[in-house]
Amino acid sequence: MDRNSNPNRQPVELNRTSLYLGLLLVAVLGILFSSYFFN
């Protein structure tokens, strides 16, 4: 039971972290592109 609980918990945390990182990356890319377009 402990073995099953651990792998189940890790992917959820990883998915959340990757999701937040992805959003941050998209925001940074958007700002960079917008600055390029404005210039």
From Swiss-Prot:
**Alphabetized UniProt keyword annotations:** Membrane, Photosynthesis, Photosystem II, Reaction center, Thylakoid, Transmembrane, Transmembrane helix
Q: What happens when the gene is disrupted?
A: Very poor to no photoautotrophic growth, no O(2) evolution. No assembly of PSII monomers or dimers; the CP43-less monomeric intermediate is assembled.
The protein depicted here goes by the name: Photosystem II reaction center protein L
Q: Give the NCBIfam families listed for this entry.
A: PRK00753.1
Q: How does it assemble?
A: PSII is composed of 1 copy each of membrane proteins PsbA, PsbB, PsbC, PsbD, PsbE, PsbF, PsbH, PsbI, PsbJ, PsbK, PsbL, PsbM, PsbT, PsbX, PsbY, PsbZ, Psb30/Ycf12, peripheral proteins PsbO, CyanoQ (PsbQ), PsbU, PsbV and a large number of cofactors. It forms dimeric complexes.
The topology of this chain with respect to the membrane is: Single-pass membrane protein
Quote the annotated effect of F38A: Grows slightly slower than wild-type; 73% O(2) evolved, increased sensitivity to high light, 60% dimeric PSII assembled
Q: Protease as a keyword? A: no
List the GO biological process terms. Answer: photosynthesis
Q: Where in the cell is it found?
A: Cellular thylakoid membrane
Residue span of the signal peptide, if any? Answer: none
The family note in this entry says: Belongs to the PsbL family.
Residues passing through the membrane, by range: 16-37
Name the job this protein performs: One of the components of the core complex of photosystem II (PSII). PSII is a light-driven water:plastoquinone oxidoreductase that uses light energy to abstract electrons from H(2)O, generating O(2) and a proton gradient subsequently used for ATP formation. It consists of a core antenna complex that captures photons, and an electron transfer chain that converts photonic excitation into a charge separation. This subunit is found at the monomer-monomer interface and is required for correct PSII assembly and/or dimerization.
For this protein's source organism, the top of the classification is:
Bacteria, Bacillati, Cyanobacteriota, Cyanophyceae, Synechococcales
Q: Record's Gene Ontology CC terms?
A: photosystem II reaction center; plasma membrane-derived thylakoid membrane; plasma membrane-derived thylakoid photosystem II
Recorded hits in InterPro entries, A to Z, give: PSII_PsbL, PSII_PsbL_sf
Task: Fetch the Pfam families from UniProt.
Answer: PsbL
